[in-house]
């Protein structure tokens, strides 16, 4: 991507937008201003906060999901297991991911013993062999929830050059490629790969 003239700036929190009379001009960060003719708000659970300065209220809320990771040998679990909003995902190195909770607790990313116990119990119900393995890690993340579970993929209705791609909730990995392609078509002014109306809020 760098060969196309793109500069990647990682681990740089965006604190606000640079807005002018004729649209968006960039973003504000702790390291200063980054200028751009087009800006995409893809801030997950924080997207609504970034849009506040534009006068747009987007009903995106943080939904906490806690997960655990087992240390095991390869092939203890050989395929993904899905059951009642829970999943068990084997990794190539033998580690096994189990998730996840769905908690309406605002921007709180802390973990709880109750969630760990519930995930461990569910993991051992689905894969009894996991009872013999150690839980290596327990963490939480925040997902961007939308009222009807449908993401927002659109151009800002009033600000030229400002685009939005958020609200994928638990389906970010599943919907990511199609979502990015639809947004790319919008950014480039091309015929979209699918009707964007359902994602326009």
Task: For every predicted segment, state its role.
Residues 22-27, 76-78:
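Short, hydrophobic/aromatic-rich segments at coil-to-beta transitions
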Residues 127-201:
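C-terminal catalytic lobe of FAD-dependent flavoproteins
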Residues 33-34, 38-160:
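Active-site substrate-recognition segment that forms the wall
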